[in-house]
Every structure is written in C-alpha cells, then in structure tokens.
Amino acid sequence: FLGVPSCDEFGNANGYSGKACCGSLGYAMVDADNAKQVVMLTEELLPYPHNPASIEQDQVDLIVKVDRVGDAAKIGAGATRMTTNPRELLIARSAADVIVNSGYFKEGFSMQTGTGGASLAVTRFLEDKMRSRDIRADFALGGITATMVDLHEKGLIRKLLDVQSFDSHAAQSLARNPNHIEISANQYANWGSKGAAVDRLDVVVLSALEIDTQFNVNVLTGSDGVLRGASGGHCDTAIASALSIIVAPLVRGRIPTLVDNVLTCITPGSSVDILVTDHGIAVNPARPEL
C-alpha cells in the first residue's frame, strides 16, 4: 500500500504533484518494484498519462481513491526538524569546523547529513565557510532538507540526490529544480546494486542515541532496549563515506550518550571516524591522519 498525492487511472505517480506533497518516493519505488501486489492510495486522480512518474503504470495493480492520504504538514517534525536548541547548534558549529579542517572540504566535495537536530544544522554553518573559500559541493545526498535546497538554489550545491524529502521545502523543490534528483533506495545505498550513491560520498554527519569507547553507534534503541527511532542509511553511509562524523551530546537528561558498550550496535566503530560532542571532539585512533 503506497500513499501518493495524486496519480492517473493506471497508477503513474510522483510525490510532488498534488495537495499532499510529500517529495521523494525513494523507498516506495523499491517496494513497488518488488511487491507481488501494489495498491496505490491517492486523494486525487489526474488525466492519463501523468508525468513524470516515480512509480509507473506497469508496477501498479490497484488504485484506491481516499478522502485524505495523509497530513503533509507533519513532514519535518520530530527527528527531521531544524533545531533551535543552543547545545545542538554548538555541536553543529563544531562539526562544521571539523569538516573544514578535515582535508575533504574542497571544490567538488559531496556531503550528507542524517536526522537529528545537530546533524541537520551542520549545513547552515557550512554556507559562510563555502563562500569565504569559494568552494561548491558537487552533490548532497540522502534525506534532503530546506537548508540543502537553499544552498542548491544559491549555487553552492550543484545537485541534490534525494531518497527522502525531510521537510515541505525539500518536497516542493523536487517539482521546480531540475537538478534536485529523485533516487530510489536501491540507487542510494544498496550494496547489491550495480551502483550505490553512498560510494561517491566524501563527508557524512550522523547522530547517535549511544556511542561507546570503541566508537560503535546505537541509533535505534534507548538505554532500556526499547525502539526509539530508525537507522535509515546510518551504517551504509558511515562505511562508504571518506569521512564519517557522529554528533551527539555527552548526556541527555540524566542518561549518558557515551557508554562503555552500546546496547544495540547499528554502526560498528570501524566505520566511524570522529565524534563531536558539546564537550569536545574525539578522533578514532584508527584514523591518525585526521
């Protein structure tokens, strides 16, 4: 069952035509490609043929018209919000400084920021640094945000490869910016595919619920083992990128983020290069050149 803002009577659909604009259908594209039965749920039927189509007519079995497919206004809440928290902004500023001084911050570099307030906020601190050094990024990858769209429209990021639109600005940008490119999760990070975009990634900034002294990261469960979030492309981008940066506060409330051993290892420490916290920066000893 795939929810889309609109489609035609054969099921041709994208995620940005219609009132319930949700942006990239990167994950739905893989579902549609592999499922035995594909049912499209939509609130608006358009004349045939609807184009461009992220999900195409030869993949769709049934179309069901519903009164309302979802609340697009809630896209960009929770983990994909843009933070105003001073501690998260402090961490983001430090992470931007790490990127600038890493050796990977040069003309034509590529980047991704994961979910979580501090990691998403890194992009806003890179703008001035890119301008002052006359540096442009070839592409930004992954979940695309309003800040990345802003840098793209200012000419600082040449292309956006979007597997999931993190907010309404990113969702709407897909319709108007020809170099804002929708990709499937298969193209994004599938090691079994013939070409995964993560393999072209220079820098990724990711969040953590826990990280241990061996740099292993838990991004899925709380200290009690209960599911708290989703890992997305965390482990894929960490191992594939040239530089993986984890951003997290040392303590959340009374719960430490830095522990002896993570409860649930999502991304192994061998894939993690640098930890940036509100109290300092730790470089993985396996990367002495950093």
Regions found by a protein language model. Give the residues of each.
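Conserved phosphate- and dinucleotide-binding cores of soluble alpha/beta proteins
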Residues: 1-110, 121-130, 134-138, 146-290
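Active-site histidine-anchored catalytic micro-motif
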Residues: 142
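Core structural elements
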Residues: 114-120
